[in-house]
Amino acid sequence: MRYWAARADDSAPPWPGTAEIDRLEFVPAGRAAARLTHPRDVDLVTAAASALGAPPDDTAPLIILRHTKASSRKRWEGPDADRPLDPKGTAQADRLSVLLACYGIDRVVSSDALRCLDTVRPYATAVRAHVEHEPRVTEDAHEKAPQGAGDAVRELLASGDAAVLCSHRPVLPTLLEALGPLPHSAFPPADVTDQTLSPGSFVVVHRRVAGGEVEVVGVERHDL
């Protein structure tokens, strides 16, 4: 079982209740701990409040995303940059749109390869966001100058924006290494930064930026 910390959305509809849960109520961490009856739950709330050190909305996510499933490289006869998603990849991109919405992403950055652009396009369209083309994270650019891909990640990390960066499998090791040391998470570090992310899978880095300094407070991984 894994837990997340998030800010309550006042515009969310009332909780309808389930067979196990009658009512949903948000209270400050201190009051929540006082109302809990199981010591392990108290420890969980205390640890979460201590780790955050500030309200969850003081952080912003940066998502490193591998494009969804593309057409076969061997069978494609045109330029590789124009290789499209296959039907499964198109369906995955639609599913990703829902997942990305959970993180409030408002900045969409992508390799200018068609398969990457089409991976993030459904989400960008849904939230009316402009898709920024980032040529430094294409496969060709990375092969010639990998430092550029790392710089692109570090710039996004320092921006403090809630952003997603979509790129390619061969580029992922450079992008993930550019994140720097990651804090303890629910995942072993090798799993979080596994360089073999499957198509459509992503790593989320939660960070806060203050005075030009970047503090990563949490990291998670989702396999599509």
Language-model features, listed with the residues they occupy:
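Short beta-strand micro-motifs in enzyme catalytic cores
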Residues: 2-4, 201-203
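NUDIX/MutT-family hydrolases
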Residues: 3-6, 14-48
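Short, conserved phosphate/pyrophosphate- and ester-handling motifs at nucleotide-, phospho-/glycolipid
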Residues: 28, 67, 168
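Active-site-proximal alpha-helix that buttresses catalytic centers in soluble enzyme cores
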Residues: 42, 57-145, 150, 173, ...
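Short amphipathic alpha-helices and their capping/turn segments at secondary-structure boundaries
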Residues: 48-58
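Generic beta-sheet signal
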Residues: 62-63, 159-170
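Short, solvent-exposed aromatic-acidic interface loops
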Residues: 217-224
